[in-house]
Amino acid sequence: MKKLLSMALASTLLLGALTGCGFTDSSSQNPSGGGDDTSGGTRDTLVYYVSNEIRTLVPWGASDTQSFTILNNAFEGLYRLDANHEPQPALAESYTVSDDGLVYTFTLREGLQWSNGTPLTANDFVFSWLKQMSSDATNGYNFIMTDYVVNGLEYGEGTATADQVGVKALDDRTLEVTIKNPTPYFLYLTTLSMYFPLNEAYVTEQGENYGITADNMIYCGPYTITSYDPAVGTSMVKNETYWDAANVSIPKVEVKIIKDQSSALNTYLAGGLDKVNLSSADVPTYQNDPEFHTITEFRSTYLQFNLDDPAMSNLNIRKALGYAIDRSILADTILADGSTAAEGLVSFGVSGN
C-alpha cells in the first residue's frame, strides 16, 4: 500500500508498509520513529524524492532543505526529536544542567563509533561546533550557535580563542557546554544538523575533498551514503555501527530529485516512488483515496520588506499592504491545502502556539 500526502497540512500519498525506525525528512529531525509508523511488513528499500538539487553534503556549508534531509539521516546529534517533537537522548545518554541554567554537561553513550569504526568522542562535538561558529561556515546558520554558546560569536570574529569558547570535552564521553543565558529550549537546538559531530582527523585528512563524494565522508547516523550526485540524488544503506541500528527497519533508501510536481505524481502512480506530495489542485482528485493522508508541517510564509526602498520604509504603506491581504481567503481558497491563516511568524502547532 502506498500513501498520497498533501503538504501544508501536507496531503501525501505514501507507502504504508514501513515499521519501526526509518528514513526521516528534514522537518522531523528524528530518524528513529519520527516519521510515519504504519502496519505491514518491513520493506527493503524506500524510494523517496526531493524537489530540488541536493547542493552539498558538507555540514558547515548546507543551507537547503534537500541537503538537510540527507544529513539528518547520515548524522545525529546529542538529542533527537520523537514523534511528538520532544527531544530524546540520541548520541548523548543523559545530561545535567547547572542551577543557573547556563552549564549543560552531556554524557555520551558508551561505545559510539563512526561508520569506519573510529570511536566517536566528545572532542568530535567540540571540533564540529567550533567549525560551525568559525569563518569556515558558509551556510549562514552559525548564529544558531553563536547566539547561545559563550564566546561563540567572538570566536567567529577572531577576537576569542578556541579555549575561550563555551564548549569543552572533559573526557571522551563528557561534553560541557556553557551558554550565555538560560535557554529552556536548548535541548531542541542540539537536534539540529549544525550541532552534529564531525571527526577532526578525518575531516582534516580529506581537506577540500571532504563531502565532494560519498566516499569522502564518514557517518554517525542511522544511514551511510553510498552514492551522491547533486542533480540526480543519493543512495543510502543502514549504518551497522549506529548505536540504535537494531531499530532501523528500512535497510536501503533511494532519494531521487524530481523538480516537477506532476512528474513526481506520475512517477508515484507508476510505482516509482513510495511517497509524493500533492499540490492543492490534486487534492480533490485523491482526497478519498485510501492512500491519501494529511500531515501538519510547521512553517510560515511571509512578506519581507526592503526598508531601503522609499515606499517600503513608510510604516503606513507596510501596514496597508498587510491589511490588503485577506489571509483566510489566501489559505482557504487559493492554497486550499489545509493551510491556516497566520497571526504571527511562529507556526500553529509549534510548542507554545
Language-model features and meaning:
Residues 179-248, 252:
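Gly/Pro-rich hinge or "lid" segments in bacterial periplasmic/extracellular proteins
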Residues 141-201:
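Surface-exposed binding/hinge segments that line
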Residues 1-46, 86, 205:
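Short, low-complexity disordered leader/linker segments with a strong preference
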Residues 49-99, 218:
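N-terminal lobe/hinge region of extracytoplasmic solute-binding protein
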Residues 341-353:
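Structural transition elements
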Residues 237-241, 297-320, 324, 333:
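A bilobed periplasmic-binding-protein/Venus flytrap-type ligand-binding module shared by bacterial periplasmic
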Residues 214, 240-284:
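Ligand-site clamp/hinge motif
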Residues 93-141, 176, 311:
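Aromatic- and charge-enriched surface segment that lines or borders ligand/interaction sites
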